[in-house]
């Protein structure tokens, strides 16, 4: 079994990705098979470069390097209440370091941290733990602006 993510576009599956870093405290390694790092990649949807880190994978900076240059990074997750601050801090750091938008989507279950957010490449956060849906318009110019202003070689 795999912990698998599906990305849909125009009613079609355009990408699947299996989790590579299984969470040991959740005994995921007993139930799932880890995938390979090479499976983490940037995909193109309508000119947007999109990448995904699944849950616990957020904690591994070597994986951040793997998705360098993505415009949007997705992070579906189930981080617990005790690690809420970690989740929010690491998600913001990912946006700043990779100069990309991050969509951090954490479980809203009562035992989970919530903390879902849309984070801009400048680190600005759209977040509301009381909402079930967050939405924002992405401006690719904002990505280009930060990458030009603070040039770390991502253009």
Where on the chain are the PLM-derived regions?
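CN hydrolase (nitrilase-like) catalytic-core segments centered on the catalytic cysteine
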Residues: 59-134
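Long, non-catalytic architectural segments outside compact domain cores
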Residues: 141-143
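A short acidic/small-residue loop/turn micro-motif
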Residues: 20-23, 131-135
């Amino acid at each position: 079994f795999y912990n698998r993510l599906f990305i849909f576009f125009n009613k079609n599956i355009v990408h699947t990705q299996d989790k590579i870093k299984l969470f040991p405290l959740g005994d995921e390694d007993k139930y799932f098979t880890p995938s390979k790092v090479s499976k983490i990649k940037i995909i193109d949807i309508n000119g947007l470069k999109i990448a995904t880190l699944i849950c616990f994978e957020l904690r591994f900076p070597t994986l951040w390097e793997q998705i360098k240059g993505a415009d949007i990074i997705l992070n579906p997750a189930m981080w617990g209440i005790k690690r809420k601050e970690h989740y929010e801090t690491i998600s913001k750091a990912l946006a700043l370091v990779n100069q990309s938008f991050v969509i951090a989507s954490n479980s809203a279950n009562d035992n989970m941290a919530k903390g879902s957010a849309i984070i801009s490449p400048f680190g600005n956060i759209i977040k509301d733990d009381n909402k079930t849906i967050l939405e924002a318009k992405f401006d690719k110019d904002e990505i280009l602006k930060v990458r030009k202003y603070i040039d770390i070689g991502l253009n």
